[in-house]
Curated annotation (Swiss-Prot):
The modification Phosphothreonine is found at T285, T543. Keywords: Cytoplasm, Cytoskeleton, Developmental protein, Microtubule, Phosphoprotein, Repeat, WD repeat. The lineage of its organism: Eukaryota, Metazoa, Chordata, Craniata, Vertebrata. Residues 10-42 form the LisH domain. Residues 371-380 have a biased composition (Basic and acidic residues). This is WD repeat-containing protein 47. Gene3D superfamilies: YVTN repeat-like/Quinoprotein amine dehydrogenase. It comes from Mus musculus (Mouse). GO terms for molecular function: protein-containing complex binding. Residues 45-102 form the CTLH domain. WD repeats lie at residues 605-644, 660-699, 707-749, 754-792, 799-838, 841-880, 887-919. GO terms for cellular component: axon; cytoplasm; dendrite; growth cone; microtubule; neuron projection; neuronal cell body. The gene is Wdr47.
């Protein structure tokens, strides 16, 4: 033994000891916070297991069930047991939300949370091990609090989630193991090792003190040896050296052969008494203030200061040099429980900066309409329309902004007191936000009554002539505009870009036609087409365009709509240059189903569901992202042979990267120049891949952004107005914010807050405008020049509204289309500020909507496994021709038009992505 020895101690191992201790004492809130801050996890897990663990700890139960789908086909995997564990945890958390609200005397909101709990219980029935287990779960519904049950006396969400993972980890460890060459011995602290080391350290200090007393002649009795133990301050023997060991080594061997009495050490531990406030705050904070599924509870951060700070720290407003990509995150969102897979499939969009190519997907005036010989065409029933402004329009999110310098940090002396008041402050903030929401509801009710009164006053008598109808309609609209102006509702910040609606009415009246509709949205007047082309020549939208094209966007001509348009199959007149003739068909043509308008050309099959597809702006490539974490870039065929549809070929894969993300790829998007490919995933990361379209290879390291604290549902690009670089727009679950990122500088720009539910869809146009669709049943328009929300469009025109799963804006920037979870599509006049029509093209969730580059057709994909095209070349206030153009064997997730040809891509849960083309 040398005079100096070295002992290696890793701080990571010390943290693992602490994590093991916190886990053994069920202090899981502190354990998870330490994991997040240190980045250390006590255990040896594979990447897949770590990802599954994070999903469970975040409470993303639908994501967990989807992640584990590949294992469910294996016989050894206990699918029933796994689903029982996950759904039971989901049910208990729903009960926790309900109980917390009932404890706060909010009976008017119980129906929302109780409905969620009952749905979870219903799903659990088929997976319960026995009827007794199911009966016990049913009994929990009758208790005023979940913690009143003896089995759940100390239940809290954080501890329950940790135990949930430990239980399922044993089940899936065999299928997704860690490195088999490694042992957990060097990676995991266990058996309460920290406590053992503390006790051994105390005994060591006692031994040192006793030996020193013997050497110096100081008398210490045997009973006094352990009396001087001080765990916090020690006994003065603080020097870390090997003197004791060196002394023992110099003792003769005969000393160790002496007989001695073996003594037992009894350890009495005074257990920690947790404060009751801490436990109750834990029940309330993660599940009520952020994750509650009902609208009266804020679904974002429970403390408004965080949201205020986010808004006040905009670089454009405060001159900061960087964005908010690294601001603190809270645990992920559990709210907005919806139908299966409803928030799993995001849509992606791709902005373009060039004009359309010469073919314009065969939409020019020299091509035949795709509806001329369609065997599956149908007319969509039009719901009762209300030609009024949107149900909800407001500036920003409705919360008052507070400057960043307005919040003063508490002095250290008051820090402990402030921490004790956290729970009370959260309650106060919750009630403040609830009051704001109630005031908002009262305002909406007043607007609804006003609209109803205006309809009664301005209703059109069917016996009146068309001229009188026109006058009544104009009077009604003028009163609507006046009332809405008084309520300060609208997109005032857009200025001259929003024409007055009554001027549109006057223009329609002066056309000389007997049109009973207020405005023809199908086409602008002929004499204004050049002006519109000039206005939109430089518009950049999320629709990809051909870089080499110089042609202008063609616009439609006005189509007069007389009373004959009310027939079952309306006659829609084509534009003057269209050679397609009359688009209506005879009964014989309707019965002929032998000819398909669109046929399958290429089909790519994956091992799991394919979520995301995106055409390169040039149209020569398209990107595919799937649940298997694989990113592919495929070649678009140079020659389209529609006659070979009976035997579709596999596309040529030019680029492939396995495990591009740790989780499923939810969305993909190309930059306007086509040199960047962005992907979003449920691993909460956005990756931007520099890509060379000519060589089909990555040209540099990936850019990785981690500003989101939930699944990224959608991505879109727009060209930066100042730097010329690509600006990435991303949104999803978690904090429900929209983030803008300068990809050239790798810096965050803005964090746009306002939505109160998962953001499912994004779309960009005009170089600064963004449309977002959300689980909160609204569409919001954002102007990056401000930057803030400039308009809110609700979906509650009919019934209770529905979550918005997809949004799109036509190339002219005049018309918004939405796809919603109640199987409906909404067409909304952006400039006029009113809904044009809401119709139901599908029988299930509409997950994808896209305008063709010429805005002649609207492509929709749905969970009903069908892909349909709506003809927009007529009066959009009337019934619209509809045609089935494709079908999958499972849910359709995304559909995207080609940039030039009359072709489109569709992705599906049947694990395929299909390229369809017009058969002519």
């Amino acid at each position: 033994m040398t005079a100096e020895e070295t002992v290696n101690v890793k701080e990571v191992e010390i943290i693992k000891l602490i994590l093991d201790f916190l886990n053994s004492k069920k202090l899981h809130i502190s354990m998870l916070a330490l994991e997040k801050e240190s980045g250390v996890i006590n255990g040896l897990f594979s990447d897949d297991m770590l990802f599954l663990r994070q999903l469970i700890l975040d409470g993303q139960w639908d994501e967990v069930l989807q992640f584990i789908q590949p294992l469910e086909c294996m016989e050894k995997f206990d699918k029933k047991r796994f689903r029982y564990i996950i759904l039971k945890q989901k049910f208990l958390e729903a009960l926790c939300v309900n109980n917390a609200m009932s404890a706060e005397d909010e009976p008017q909101h119980l129906e929302f949370t109780m409905q969620e709990a009952v749905q979870c219980l219903h799903a659990l029935e088929e997976y319960c091990p026995s009827k007794d287990d199911y009966s016990k779960l049913c009994l929990l519904l009758t208790l005023p609090r979940l913690t009143n049950h003896a089995e759940f006396k100390d239940w809290n969400p954080s501890t329950a989630r940790v135990h949930c993972f430990e239980e399922v980890c044993v089940m899936v460890a065999e299928f997704i193991p860690a490195d088999r060459k490694l042992s957990e011995a060097g990676f995991k602290a266990s058996n309460n090792r920290l406590f053992q080391l503390v006790m051994k350290g105390l005994l060591y200090e006692c031994c040192v003190e006793f030996c020193q007393s013997k050497a110096t002649g100081e008398e210490i009795t045997e009973s006094e040896v352990l009396l001087g133990i001080d765990l916090l301050c020690g006994n003065g023997c603080d020097d870390l050296d090997l003197s004791l060991l060196s002394w023992l080594q110099n003792l003769p061997s005969s000393v160790f052969s002496c007989a001695f009495e073996q003594k037992m050490l009894n350890i009495h531990v005074d257990k920690l008494l947790k404060p009751t406030k801490a436990a109750y705050a834990d029940l309330l904070t993660p599940l009520i203030s952020k994750l509650s599924p009902y609208p009266s509870s804020p679904m974002r951060r429970p403390q408004s200061a965080d949201a205020y700070m986010t808004r006040s720290l905009n670089p454009a407003l405060d001159g900061l040099t960087c964005g908010l990509t690294s601001h603190d995150k809270r645990i992920s969102d559990l709210g907005n429980k919806t139908s299966p897979m409803s928030h799993s499939f995001a849509n992606f969009h791709y902005p373009g900066v060039q004009n359309l190519s010469r073919s314009l997907m065969l939409e020019n005036t020299e091509c035949h309409s795709i509806y001329e010989e369609s065997p599956e065409r149908s007319d969509t029933p039009v719901e009762a329309q209300q030609p009024v402004s949107s149900e909800a329009m407001c500036q920003g999110s409705g919360l008052e902004k507070e400057p960043a310098n307005g919040a003063q940090n508490p002095v250290p002396a008051k820090q402990e007191k402030n921490e004790l008041r956290d729970s009370t402050e959260q309650f106060q903030e919750y009630y403040r936000q609830r009051l704001r929401y109630q005031q908002h509801l009262e305002q909406k009710e007043q607007q609804r009554q006003m609209y109803q009164q205006m309809l009664l006053e301005g209703g059109v008598n069917q016996e009146d002539g068309p001229d009188q109808q026109q006058n009544l309609t104009e009077q009604f609209l003028n009163r609507s505009i006046q009332k809405l102006g008084e309520l300060n509702i609208g997109m005032d910040s857009l200025g001259n870009e929003v024409p007055v609606l009554n001027q549109q009415c006057s223009g329609s009246k002066n056309n000389g036609s007997n049109n009973s509709s207020v405005t023809s949205f199908s086409t602008p007047p002929q004499d204004s087409s050049q002006r519109l082309i000039h206005d939109t020549a430089n518009i950049h939208t999320s629709t990809p365009r051909n870089p080499g094209s110089t042609n202008h966007i063609p616009f439609h001509e006005d189509s007069p709509c007389g009373s004959q348009n009310s027939s079952e199959h309306s006659v829609i007149k084509p534009s003057p240059g269209d050679s397609s003739g009359n688009l209506s068909r005879s009964k014989g043509e309707e019965d002929d189903k032998s000819k398909k308008q669109f046929v399958c050309i290429n089909t790519l099959e994956d091992t799991q569901a394919v979520r995301a597809v995106a055409f390169h702006p040039s149209g020569s490539l398209y990107a595919v992202g799937s649940n298997s974490k694989t990113l592919r870039v495929c070649a678009y065929p140079e020659k389209m042979d529609a006659s070979a549809h009976d035997n579709p070929k596999q596309p040529v894969v030019r680029f492939k990267r396995n495990k591009h993300h740790k989780g499923s790829i939810y969305c993909v998007a190309w930059s306007p120049c086509g040199q960047l490919l962005a992907t979003g995933s449920n691993d909460k990361y956005v990756k931007v891949l520099p890509f060379n379209a000519e060589t089909c290879n990555a040209t540099g390291p990936d850019l990785e952004f981690s500003m989101h604290d939930g699944t990224i549902r959608d991505l879109a690009f727009m060209e930066g107005p100042e730097s010329g670089g690509a600006i990435l727009i991303s949104a999803g679950a978690g904090d429900c914010n929209i983030y803008t990122t300068d990809c050239q500088r790798g810096q965050g720009l803005h964090a746009l807050s306002g939505h109160t539910g998962h953001i499912l869809a994004l779309y960009t146009w005009s170089g600064w405008m963004i449309a977002s669709g959300s689980q909160d049943k609204t569409v919001r328009f954002w102007d990056l020049r401000v930057p803030s929300c400039v308009r809110v469009v609700g979906t509650t025109f009919h019934g209770t509204g529905s979550a918005v799963a997809s949004v799109a804006v036509d190339p002219s920037g005049r018309l918004l289309a939405t796809g919603q979870e109640d199987s409906s599509c909404m067409l909304y006049d952006i400039r006029g500020g009113r809904m044009v029509q809401s119709y139901h093209p599908h029988s299930s969730d509409v997950r994808s909507v896209r305008f063709s580059p010429g805005a002649h057709y609207l492509l929709t994909g749905s969970y009903d496994m069908k892909i349909k095209v709506t003809d927009l070349q007529g009066d959009l206030t009337k019934q619209l021709p509809l045609m089935v153009v494709g079908e999958h064997k499972d849910k359709v997730i995304q559909c995207r038009w080609h940039t030039q040809d009359l072709s489109f891509l569709s992705s599906s849960a049947d694990r395929t992505v299909t390229l369809w083309t017009y058969s002519g």
